[in-house]
Regions:
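Core alpha/beta nucleotide-donor-binding catalytic domains of modification enzymes
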Residues: 2-122, 128-143
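Conserved S-adenosyl-L-methionine
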Residues: 65, 155-166
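Short glycine-biased active-site loop of nucleotidyltransferases that positions the nucleotide triphosphate
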Residues: 73-75, 168-171
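Conserved hydrophobic/aromatic beta-strand scaffold that supports enzyme active sites
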Residues: 82, 159-161, 177-179
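Conserved Class I S-adenosyl-L-methionine
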Residues: 140-157
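Residues that flank catalytic or metal-binding motifs in active/ligand-binding sites
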Residues: 146, 158, 172-176
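Conserved beta strand-loop-helix elements of the APE1-like EEP
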Residues: 170-188
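Single conserved hydrophobic/aromatic residue that forms the stacking wall/gate
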Residues: 208-220
Length: 220
């Protein structure tokens, strides 16, 4: 599946909340078109996040209010998969946190099934910085599993921990962002081309471009 330079980029948004990923992508470029989204909060009769999402984006929200595990086969072909999957089970502050084996931690496997079914060109995921060390009993296991799953499906991966406070937010909020790209993309070609003399000399290219933190910018 190839995306031409001028065509729309079909986006699927999982664990959509009130639409944070969608807003960010649409502000970035009109090419990003969310064609399907999912938001479901177990045990919450009000489903307020889903209602807020639907109100914000109207009839074109394309948001399904159902358990993600029950609608995997409904996810249409897409170019970019995004999602901020639940973070509660990745807390290393609690020795009882089960990480990827926890009640909400297992939702990673729904993401993985969707990737296996559709193989989008790009995947962008977000979670707490503690994901890197989860679970407390076996530090780094969960993050390693996620990276290995993506690698086995033919993806190259980059990741970053970004603090929202560095970009004008009034609170410290450190989040892990995982960017995966299929081995058929130009991004993958760029990554693999780094494993040459440049890589040996420490000049490996980064595919994730991050603006300078707000606190480092001069005020005009």
């Amino acid at each position: 599946m190839k995306v031409s330079a001028n065509s729309d980029i079909r986006v699927v948004e999982l664990f959509a909340g009130v639409g944070g990923f969608r807003v960010g992508l649409e502000r970035c470029s009109e090419r990003f078109k969310t064609i399907w989204a999912n938001q479901w909060e177990p045990g919450q009769a009000g489903q307020w996040a889903y209602k807020c999402y639907s109100k914000n984006f109207g009839e074109d929200s394309h948001c399904v209010n159902a358990d993600i595990a029950t609608v995997i086969n409904q996810v249409p072909p897409h170019d970019l998969l995004v999602g901020g999957f639940p973070c509660q089970d990745y807390s290393v502050a609690s020795t009882g946190a089960k990480g990827i084996e926890g009640k909400k931690g297992v939702l990673w496997w729904s993401i993985y099934q969707i990737i296996q079914k559709n193989h989008p060109n790009y995947v962008l995921l977000e979670n707490v910085d503690r994901l890197l060390k989860s679970p407390a009993s076996q530090r780094g296991r969960d993050f390693g599993i996620i990276l290995k799953c993506l690698q086995e499906e033919g993806y190259g991966i980059e990741w970053r921990v970004i603090n929202a406070a560095d970009y004008g937010c009034v609170q410290r909020r450190r989040r892990t962002f995982i960017f995966a790209f299929k081995n058929t993309t130009k991004q993958y070609e760029r990554m693999t081309s780094c494993f040459s003399a440049d890589a040996k000399d420490g000049r490996v290219l980064s595919l994730i471009h991050i603006s300078e933190p707000t606190r480092l910018l001069s005020i005009s």
